[in-house]
């Protein structure tokens, strides 16, 4: 999320602030809202694709409406987490506990904790709101930062031994 809300010359105009945002969605809570009917139907045309595991074939169906939850009414499932400079990829380790925010214009690599994020939400550790969405305090969500591993982290992948591998524009190796 581009905190400058720039709409032109993005690489220049959307890079002034030290931190932008990762939008975290509690999809289980969103599903609860949908199940309760807290949505409006909006017309649109899209392909709904389904992969059938038994036949290893996919089918497509063209649909003409979608459920939309008005987040001005129901925003208890959306949270913003500050992340250094233009987050590109947000990657989760196999345990689901650690979330790496890859800021493509940052020299540091923040690692967030799912448990700390949940605690921050429960304890209302917010730094205000943006468009009605609570901003979780950076320190409240942060597990730690990898200092100066390179510049322009893009994505982090994990192996079975818990090691993380991050791709960069410029590496410090």
Task: Give the label of every model feature segment.
Residues 1-173:
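Predominantly soluble domains enriched in secretory-pathway, periplasmic, or organellar proteins
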């Amino acid at each position: 999320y581009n905190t400058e809300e720039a709409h032109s010359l993005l690489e220049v105009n959307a890079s002034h602030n030290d931190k932008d945002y990762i939008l975290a969605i509690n999809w289980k809570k969103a599903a609860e809202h949908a199940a309760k009917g807290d949505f409006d139907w909006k017309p649109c045309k899209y392909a709904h694709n389904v992969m059938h595991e038994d036949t290893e074939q996919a089918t497509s169906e063209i649909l003409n409406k979608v459920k939309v939850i008005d987040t001005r009414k129901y925003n208890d499932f959306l949270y913003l987490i500050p992340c250094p400079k233009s987050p590109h990829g947000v990657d989760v380790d196999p345990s689901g506990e650690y979330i790496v925010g890859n800021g493509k214009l940052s020299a540091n690599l923040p690692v967030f904790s799912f448990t700390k994020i949940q605690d921050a939400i429960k304890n209302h550790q917010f730094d205000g709101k943006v468009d009605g969405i609570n901003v979780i305090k950076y320190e409240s969500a942060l597990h730690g930062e990898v200092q100066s591993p390179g510049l322009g982290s893009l994505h982090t992948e994990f192996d079975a031994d818990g090691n993380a591998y991050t791709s960069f524009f410029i590496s410090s190796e």
